[in-house]
Amino acid sequence: MPFISPPERDEATDVRALLPVLSAAERAAALATGRALVTGARARADERPYLDAFLQEFGLSNQEGIALMCLAEALLRIPDDDTADQLIAEKLAAGDWDSHSGRSSSLFVNASTWGLMLTGRLVDLPGELKGGDTGGWLRGLTQRASEPIVRQALRRAMKIIGGEFVVGRDIGEALVRCRREPALALCSFDMLGEGARTDADAARYADAYASAIEAIARADGPAGDVHGRHTISIKLSALDPRYSALQRGRTLARLLPRVQELARLAAARGLGLTIDAEEQDRLELSLEIVEALLRDPATRDRPGLGLAVQAYGRRAPAVIDHLVALARDLRRPLAVRLVKGAYWDSEVKRAQERGLPGYPVYTRKVSTDVAWLACARRLLAAAPLVYPQFATHNAHGIGAILAMRPRGVPMEFQRLHGMGGLLYDEARRSLPDFPPVRAYAPVGPHADLLAYLVRRLLENGANTSFVNRFMDGSVPVEQVVADPETQLAGLGEALAHPGIPLPAALYGAARRNSRGLDLGREATLDGLRAVLRQDGAAASSALAPPPPFARPADVEAAFARAAQSLTGWSRGPVDERAACLERAADALEADRDRFLALLVHEAGKTAGDAIAEVREAADFCRYYAAEARRLQGAPTMLAGPTGEANSLEMTARGTWACISPWNFPLAIFAGQVVAALVTGNTVVAKPAETTPRIALAFGELLHAAGVPKDALSVLPMVGREFGETALAHPALAGVVFTGSTATGRWLNRALATRDGAILPLIAETGGINAMIVDSTALPEQVVDDAVNSAFGSAGQRCSALRLLCLQDEVADRIIEMLEGAMDTLVVGDPADLATDVGPVITTAAADGLRAHI
């Protein structure tokens, strides 16, 4: 019973489908409860956790909050003093600290502001601080940042900040703290850390999860009601370094057994195990794994398996419906933790970068709030087969759940450790028979805090966040607990955020963004597999024999035709030429399948690289069309010192020779050719000898879009023959070249021997690309970027990483992680979607690499 993503719709349609959620009576009850909770909690402001106070003062809406978060993240893992000192100086110089000093009643917040915590106590304040000159003192501190006491003080302060997010450095320490603190009597433990980058990482995380399950079971004593005990949350990305839809086969073969082993262990110990939600492009695969776990006969009679669902995902209602149907079909209870969502910023940016039709998440927070309520109603209706777990720090959300909850339905609330404590304490104090509250409790060394810290701040540090406004007395209670359905109704038709354009409109009026593919959907991948099959229609054209190479006489004839057509083409309106390019971009996207097959089968591109190259070619067409209109649309009027009219007009130079490489046989070929054409020039283009079909197909597309055939000739032929003929032709007006440095030098020398005016040579050649890494960089991000840069396109691009320079203190760790990540790469057939690294372009190229190694 696989989950099938619903058809993509516009965001407004998805939002309207959620409504209505609350009845009038439920809405009134939710508002009354929320109002009472906020009022009661504000009366106890001095009891709030440090972290709530910190987030109210230092959100992500001011430079000082960002500076402190950078320090909190990086100082905990920078091993060397010099780098730490430089970071401290940079971040302390970045903010207006006077605006925060003394403003909060929390000692913790002011200590963080001044950076004066040292071994658990405050040092004496200097005189200028007592007089209120915090900014002046901090500027002086910046200049003295090499002093060990300053470094120690700030490291201590940052550890305290980190400790507010983390319940213990290991599971043993966490369990001791839970026994000591009543607010942690019921927890779901999360082992901190980035997703695995190596198989060794994955094995280490699996061992950590298993050890934690055993430790929790020992600490909890004999098994009872699974929902009355501590539970554990696991991230699938921590258990396999290649957890993605493109690696589905590997994931099911390697990740699934590992998760099954943990689920069986948790079931045997009577503990709940929850699969954490991650990025939306992993949603379908994660649900496939959850279904396999539910069907496992070894755990069938043991409740406790659960997963998190992110309400900001526009597929969340369909996911809830699928899970309920699955639980009923299998007669297997399932716990569902309903959260708002933790990756909103990256989901939006990723959709923009990938050119997706829309966003996988709602663009307005109020829409997420309504979706959370709509999903909550579905879960409550499915209880007790589904055990709802509502994760919220929102007083209105608590009130709405209590208003919707049928009498006697088992459920629980959840909160993040360090946040929401006062809100739930007030709820337990003032509301009879309040449901259990579980703390989501991260466990791990402070150095592993980054990913968790950033997600929590993005969730809770924004101006619109309930946590940010909850205790702010300047914000009216009615505004804090406002009903999201009412807020949504006030938006009218503007249900999608007007400040977040669709990915296609990312560049505004200038041009349209190129269209990509959502590779997280199995239906998309099935279509792509069909396109790339060697016996498919698209591949057949890619594998057809290429035409015979042109000869020098063909070059002469092409230049003659180009020179003859120059006047008519260049004197036409720039709008007409730009429109040709825009039609070509549209046609390229409409015929994407054929070009993907050509790139994979002729150039050896992997599917991901091929998609990116088609998009880049379309972007070139639209970008140069927009630039030509800007530069040539009207003359630029210049000053006339003696009353005369002076204007500057950009015109075509003549006929250009465009020589493109095999490593980007579509994108670079297209960029060279369309830039010359749209400005009124004519072109004789020589594509790479190994990839002629791609260039010829794009040339045909340009002709169909309106470029005269005589204005563009595409001549596959031997490079030296073309160069010797073209560079000697009297009609030549310039050369555009991308390729080796040696060939670029030869072209430069050949042009220098010509009589007459000096012709322009626009040359892009090779080089050594380096990445320089210091100890402030997160190792996982370094490895991700290094692997992508060095081995994308099999390393066959001029921008590929060639030299990685690492600071001594972190070199060994990064090298070990890099080696492990490289070991997980799949080298093979580029038509296989699981392939990461395809073949190099020729046998000679492969032999050269082997010789170099």
What are these regions (language model features)?
Residues A391, V674, G734-T738:
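Periplasmic-binding protein-like
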Residues A645-S647, S713-V736:
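A structured beta-alpha segment of the ubiquitous adenosine-cofactor-binding alpha/beta core
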Residues A634-K709, G766, E780:
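Conserved small-residue-rich beta-alpha loop and adjacent elements
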Residues L701-V707, A728-H729, G734, A742-I853:
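ALDH superfamily catalytic-core signature
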Residues R156-V176, R180-C187, R197, A212, ...:
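Catalytic cores of nucleotide-enabled group-transfer and carboxylate-activating enzymes in metabolic
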Residues A562, R577, L599, C621, ...:
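Residue-level signal for inorganic ion chemistry
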Residues M1-N513:
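Positively charged, amphipathic and often flexible ligand-engagement surfaces
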Residues P432-F434, V443-A587, A597-L598, A612-A626, ...:
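Terminal low-complexity tails and localization/encapsulation signals of metabolic enzymes
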